Amino acid sequence: MIKHIVLFKFNASADKEAKLQQIKTELEQLPDIIPELKEIHVGLNTNPAEKWDLSLEAFVEHWQDLDTYANHPAHQKIVKNLIAPLKADPACVDFQI
């Protein structure tokens, strides 16, 4: 099993909170669309003193499944339409568990 963790810091915008909730909702639907994605947890930071706005924790069975998930059209649509416009500054780590 591979664990994929991403932390996002987004630029400020008038509708940032609504956009973060939309990103969370859409990411949480991906296991129903991408069979290789076994589980996903998305959290919105509630502590304004912290740097990161959103965290993602995803689980796939094999390393190649991580590529399948990352390149899947449903995932890419979220990245292109929701994450990229907010100019995300991500930090990522992947490891076998």
What is the role of each PLM region?
Residues 59, 63-92:
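An amphipathic, aromatic/His-enriched active-site/gating alpha helix that lines ligand/cofactor pockets
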Residues 1-53, 61-71, 94-97:
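Short S/T/G/P-rich N-terminal loop/turn motif that feeds into the first structured element of a domain
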